[in-house]
Amino acid sequence: TRDGRILPLLQTVSEVRDSHGVLTHHIAVMTDISSIKETQSRLDFLAHHDVLTELPNRLLFSDRLHHVIERAQREGHTIALLFIDLDHFKNINDSLGHQVGDQLLIEVAQRLRSLVRRSDTLARLGGDEFVVLMENHASHATAAGLADKVVAAFKQSFLVNGIDLFIGCSIGITVYPEDGADAVTLLKNADTAMYRAKDAGRDGHVRYNAELSEATRSKIELDHALRAAVRDGG
């Protein structure tokens, strides 16, 4: 274009022949397909990002996590995961409505963006669950340092529709390869640690260890036993 922009064009070439079937010339038609390309790019973005916050979604995050683990395995370095779950978000959603809840999630995403490093991946897994992937030889110390910053940042209110909302968060931390050698295990164990942070009083962070999984398994078995006892007794 005259202003230096490059436009994607679709070229269609047709043959023109005379009455004897002899090719005499060609006709080329150029069509601007910028809008089509923009639509395709937008659809691709929406397939891999959360519509509300525009953060990477679970699909894109899982793909990145797999690749980062493969690279960490080859190069022999560590990575860390922070599994972040908002405390009492459902209360706000139920009392003030989903519109306020959605806007709060947008504000939370923006605050988290301001805290993570450029090399980190921040994603929304769904609902009020966020996760941070820390690369480049991340350790428990660096992960705990970021978790402390997140918890401290959530001490400040979130302004939504003229209302100051206070909400905390519980964070579970895992480090590869010590706390999981694959993406599924690493994320599952971070989730387990997050729930322990909630059990410990919320508004804090917990590092995963094997005892947490055993405690979680025992709790599930106890819940099943209690449900069975109630069912059989009824």
Regions found by a protein language model. Give the residues of each.
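Cyclic nucleotide signaling catalytic output domains
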Residues: 122, 149, 153, 159, ...
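PAS-family sensory domains
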Residues: 1-4, 17-18, 22-32
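Conserved long alpha-helical elements within nucleotide-processing catalytic cores of c-di-GMP signaling
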Residues: 37, 41-48, 54-81, 87-117, ...
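Sensory-domain boundary capping and coupling elements
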Residues: 11-13, 30, 168
